[in-house]
Regions:
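Intrinsically disordered, low-complexity segments enriched in small/polar residues
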Residues: 13-14, 31, 65
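Generic structural motif
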Residues: 17-19, 36, 67
Length: 84
């Protein structure tokens, strides 16, 4: 497994429009990148609404949760076992 030392986990709140919506809509996404700008293509691709007017309302680099450090590891080519 490869550690992603220069990448970080970001929690992002997106805002934008969607067809038939009368107000701005929001979505929350988790993305990985070395800086927030590296995540823009993924965020655009995953947005369900119109790309016109899509914007980031807020984001946070997540490095620690409840006293635990977040380490990103690439498991793309490894089987992940489900725990019961």
């Amino acid at each position: 497994m490869k550690t992603l030392e220069n990448n970080f986990l970001y929690l992002v709140v997106l805002g934008g429009r969607a067809e038939k919506a009368n107000i701005e809509l929001h979505d929350v996404r988790w993305v990985v990148g070395s800086k927030i700008e590296d995540t823009y293509d993924t965020l655009r691709k995953d947005w369900f609404g119109s790309s016109r007017g899509l914007h980031i309302d807020s984001y946070k680099k997540i490095q620690y949760i409840d006293g635990y450090k977040i380490n990103l590891i690439n498991v793309e080519n490894h089987k992940i076992e489900k725990s019961n």
